[in-house]
Amino acid sequence: MTIRKQHHWLTLLAVLMTIGLVVNSANTATAQTKKKPNIVLIWGDDVGWNNPSAYNRGMMGYKTPNIDRIAREGALFTDWYGQQSCTAGRAALITGQSPFRTGLLKVGLPGAKEGLSIKDPTLAGLLKNHGYMTGQYGKNHLGDRDEHLPTNHGFDEFFGNLYHLNAEEEPENEDYPKDPEFKKKYGPRGVIKSFADGRIEDTGPLTKKRMETVDEEVNAGALDFMDRAVKADKPFFLWWNSTRMHINTHLKKDSKGKTGLGVYADGMVEHDGHVGEVLDKIDELGITENTIVMYSSDNGAECFTWPDGGSTPFRNEKNSNWEGGYRVPCVIRWPGVIEPGSIHNGIFSHEDILPTILAAAGDPDVKEKLMKGYNVNGRDCKVHLDGYNLLPYFKGEVDESPRKEFFYWTDDGNLANLRYGRWKLVFMEQRAHGFDVWQEPFVTLRLPKLFCLRTDPFERADHEAIGYGKWRFERIYLLVPAQAYVSKHLATYKEFPPRQKPGSFALDQVLEKLQEAGTSGR
């Protein structure tokens, strides 16, 4: 063979090899696209709407580049609703049901009997039907007992704490009873490691000192979970729940003074660094294009604990009926589905995540199935989902969010407000501020207050606008449509009633039990 012919054949071989590599690469990309998406839900705790710099635009003097990256590569939502407190917000997301329906409205305390029922399926359990590995890392706050642990509700594994941080550190209070029996009965459990096969390990108390680095422990476990899922070639669902930024913030030495703006800003920067570690791991594993990433928080900002407290431009704060108690930051990256850099102003809520994710996993009719009765990870379940499937909207198949309304339930189980479209009607209002919102009762109004959340998103008109009374009076016609929304929603509780009564910080339930016991004894 001549040198020229040899060169010709070598060139042809190189071309064929290149074509083969391109075809093989295309096939690999197609296979990756066809895989069920991985889901990573990253949650802060009590992080205010205004705390990520994607929302505050740097006006708070620090940056959260990793949370901002999710917004830049995905979408930012201005009107995303959590709930009024920790337990309710987490229950809404993981069950897709109104927390009034699950009875998980009141903040869970050590020793409390209320918790997530096995009759209420979770996003994790439903994804097990589709072959997912499921892991929850970080704060749970959906019940104190073993039966309430995530690993009894669809998660393969769990590592985290069960309550808010200030409850975890109560045993270190100088007046805390020294009697071991008191702590055993009423004290917080430690940081729990559990598995779906029934193994449960208490890894020790979440002390003030451990709080400095517990999120690092949690993050290490979460990264390892993703590693193992990818090696097993299985789609995975990771719910990563930070302890930041709930009070009380205890920072390690390296995190203190980072911003020069105090403990909350320093904590947010540390927290954002943990978010960055998760995003970097997703990149390292080569699964970025097939992984949905959401960042959000459970409830509105807790402002009364400032300077160790969140920030929101909205009225009032956590545990009130006002927007400040319910609006949360939310950014979602979903390659190939959500347009990068987009901003969405429609109404959305945590309840919508479950049906949306299930649709992405190949189960768009899960809501209808569950209403008729559906086997979820080996359990027969029949429930009413209150969330909406957002996938057609995210794909651009419809122009608006399917959610047109949002119901604001108080932690006592009362319907305080309704939002439909741009209108918000207030049936009960919290007139207290600061810590007193946890103490003072809501005031029931004979005629609802009215707000337009487009022209008055911060609900200032009723106490600042000279013409508010006339404006409100001229729009009484909005009341009957609001009643129709409420009637339709409440009608669903006839077939699917609340699972349990929400807990109580007062004596009403104790007195009720005594009355029931007295009646039954007659």
Q: In which residue ranges do the predicted regions lie?
A:
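Formylglycine-dependent sulfatase
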Residues: T2-R4, L10-P448, L453, P457-R522
